[in-house]
Amino acid sequence: MPIITLQYEDLESLTKADKDTIIDRVPMIGADIERIEKEAIDIEFFPDRPDLYSVEGVARAMRGFMNIETGLCQYEVTPSGVHIELDEKIKEVRPVLGCAIVKGINFTSSSIKSLMDLQEDLHWGLGRNRKKVSIGVHDMTNIEPPFKYQAVSPDFEFVPLDFTEPMTMDEVLEKHPKGVRFANILEGMEKYPLITDSEGKVLSFPPIINGTLTRVEESTTDLFIDVTGLGDAVYTALSIVVSALAERGGKIESVKVVYPDGTEKVTPDMTPRTLNVPRSDIDSLIGIKLTDDEIINELKRMRFDASVLEDGDMFEISVPTYRADILHNFDIVEDIAIGYGFDKIKSEFPKSATIGCAHPISVTRGVMREIMVSLGYSEVMPFTLTSQKVHFEWMNREETDDVTFVLHPISEDQTMVRTTILPNLIEIFSLNQHHELPQRLFEVGEVVVNSKNRLHLAAASIHAQANFTEIREVLDAVMRERDIEYEVVVSEDPAFIEGRRADILVNGEKVGMMGELYPEVIINFGLGQPIVGFEIDLTE
């Protein structure tokens, strides 16, 4: 989780409260104080609150929580008259772009550091180390709009930030510290993204490094901000950055993004979205009945706007664009509880006393872990959310109708709940190619089939001599330890080599499968060694 260093002078100025009061109250909004020093305080926030990754965001939240300034923050956005054109080929490289101009900023060394820290924390929290989102911040003094976002040849030359001589883009990836660190994002691409001005001067080589021409100094007053990436998180990151700058007196101006087909998108869009939350959700989740005025007051303290709809049973809530964590009504209810104060919600003793014991599924899970570890396998715990590409396309399988999909996915990597575990294990192999072979992994975890949770055990092994006999011996050991009689029956599955795949039957019913992965599947995951694996259902 990100640890934010907040300078007291900055914090007191932006919050309009003294440091002792802030230190006393800041844990109540979901922060852990890591360190208190003479000039600054280090605070750790949960990753789901990227709007609190800066002193400006913390100050905004604290002003509301302490009743200094409540309700929705209104950030005025005026048209700049500036536009940026997208090249046709950029959609194959890094297709999503959001831009803004912020003018009239009075920078100090500490405010520049705060902005750069926010930028890097967003790269981590929202951007998956710049893969999904990367942010460029530019001094506008030496550049002339309109701008262009294009895909160019890797031999294009420019002077990157912190260097004095021109380098090709390939050289940047090989020699510049940022290039070396993030080169994997552009691996395999024939063209690289580039942002230039009307005179061809380079602003940015996203997601790697800015050009040296637009370095931000204390004398900088006007900024051009570009955010590139792969999805809607781009626009959230842009909102967080420009709202932080507006907290320091910056004036936000919009930029028109012009796509190759002539369509246009004006960014940033700071228009709040609306959620309707039933009173029944609030009452049942918090456990106490608050009045309408109390609910609205707590929402305003948490920097929302709210009103009661005519039927009296529904609250209409305006959510600011920088709140990336508000995905469901439950998130709103949580903020109401935070605003009200968990210390005010009294706990109750249970009406009856019982003696607990481990659930049979938990016992099975523990036993299977012990068995697999004793067989030389390492346990992993990947996400249960995955994508159709990994789960079906890369496994050479047709999409089935027993899948549970995510209604509004925020990432193309997490669009469905897995129905099997093996694709996750193979994906981990692809991420661990820098480790020596053999690698043997297992997971005892949940899958969802036909909207029902099932507990599965999956194991996989990768090395040059991996074969059906090896994985059969592992399965034999597992079943022997559990005193389960089973049989295997040859079956077909496009993910496995024909004749080297079998169903696992217990009492005549299929409980799993095993086999050698088909070479094309192995290649789909970017691997080059044989893989064998099995997966069984432990639910019954």
UniProtKB/Swiss-Prot annotation:
It comes from the Archaea. The keyword Transmembrane helix does not apply. Gene3D superfamilies: 3.30.56.10, Bira Bifunctional Protein, Domain 2, Phenylalanyl-trna Synthetase, Chain B, domain 3. One of its GO terms (biological process) is phenylalanyl-tRNA aminoacylation. GO terms for molecular function: ATP binding; magnesium ion binding; phenylalanine-tRNA ligase activity; RNA binding. Keywords: Aminoacyl-tRNA synthetase, ATP-binding, Cytoplasm, Ligase, Magnesium, Metal-binding, Nucleotide-binding, Protein biosynthesis. This is Phenylalanine--tRNA ligase beta subunit. The gene is pheT.
